């Protein structure tokens, strides 16, 4: 059953029809100008608001709303010691697992890079979907392939009142066209992991969800996002998340996370057209 569904996604994910090649001119007009020459030590992401230190794992807990029901949610994000070259830029690989009611709902690897100016870019995602903890298929988008474009996840100097920015674009079946805008700075927020000052609030939305649906993300300096909220009558998921734990993984735990990320890569269909992920040269992780 899983193999059949995976083959279906392969057809959707690759240019086997005109639908994938199509993207609106509106999307093209609002994309960020991407210059691969403006990246140097790009897998070293040390942006104040979006630091990605290999071996760091963050855990969030909260709720989503599905069919009028409040569903417990848990998200575990791990910065691996893997890198991957996408569209000529070396990215760091982040492994993200979403749990609903204690069961894996989605598992994905996400690719980030920092440019010379300090902006953090999103260059793609490979997402696996599970039904009752059983793998049923995957979807992927990678910048520079099949009409997909990189976007900015965090500005080097985020300021209120500045224009919104594209967080990337991926045509169907992924349908990624999110935008971010700086909402507030200098805020205070308390979550189970602690209380934080100088918090930055980013409002995110998508044309696919409509103008009356936004996700609010709260970023603490030196930590990353610590809280997720929502606003708007059109918001369907109504996800709320709070940071509950920040962990520095042991070499063995990091090796296990690396292995899980590589397994996702092995199951992917787009990866036959890109170089494989590699272990960071500076990594001293064990378990090779």
PLM segments and residue spans:
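Detector for methionine-enriched segments
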Residues: 1, 145, 153-154, 280
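Bacterial N-terminal signal peptides
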Residues: 2-15
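Sec/Tat signal peptide C-region and signal peptidase I cleavage site
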Residues: 16-20
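Acidic, serine/threonine-rich low-complexity disordered tracts
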Residues: 23-116, 122-129, 158-288
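Acidic/charged, solvent-exposed loop-and-adjacent secondary-structure segments enriched in E/D, K/R, S/T
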Residues: 134-151
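Short aromatic loop motif centered on NTY/YTY
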Residues: 149-154, 178
């Amino acid at each position: 059953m899983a193999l059949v569904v995976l083959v279906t996604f392969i057809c959707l994910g690759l240019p086997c029809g005109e639908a994938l090649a199509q993207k609106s001119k509106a999307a093209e007009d609002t994309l960020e100008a991407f210059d691969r020459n403006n990246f140097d030590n790009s897998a070293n992401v040390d942006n104040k608001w979006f630091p990605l230190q290999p071996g760091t794992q963050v855990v969030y807990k909260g709720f989503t709303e599905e069919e009028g029901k409040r569903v417990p949610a848990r998200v575990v994000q791990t910065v691996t010691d893997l890198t991957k070259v996408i569209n000529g830029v070396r990215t760091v690989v982040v492994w993200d697992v979403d749990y609903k009611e204690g069961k894996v709902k989605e598992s994905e690897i996400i690719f980030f890079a920092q440019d010379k100016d300090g902006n953090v870019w999103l260059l793609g995602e490979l997402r696996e979907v599970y039904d009752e903890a059983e793998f049923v298929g995957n979807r992927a988008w990678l910048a520079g392939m099949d009409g997909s474009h990189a976007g900015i996840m965090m500005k080097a100097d985020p300021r209120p009142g500045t224009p919104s920015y594209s967080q990337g674009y991926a045509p169907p079946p992924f349908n990624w066209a999110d935008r971010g805008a700086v909402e507030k700075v200098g805020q205070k927020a308390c979550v189970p992991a602690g209380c934080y000052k100088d918090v930055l609030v980013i409002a995110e939305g998508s044309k696919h969800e409509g103008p009356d649906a936004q996700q609010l993300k709260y970023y603490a300096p030196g930590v990353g996002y610590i809280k997720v909220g929502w606003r708007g009558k059109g918001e369907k998921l109504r996800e709320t998340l709070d940071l509950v734990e920040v962990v520095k993984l042991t070499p063995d735990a990091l090796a296990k996370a690396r292995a899980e990320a590589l397994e996702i890569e092995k199951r992917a269909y787009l990866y036959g057209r890109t170089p494989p992920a590699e272990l960071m040269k500076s990594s001293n992780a064990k378990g090779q």
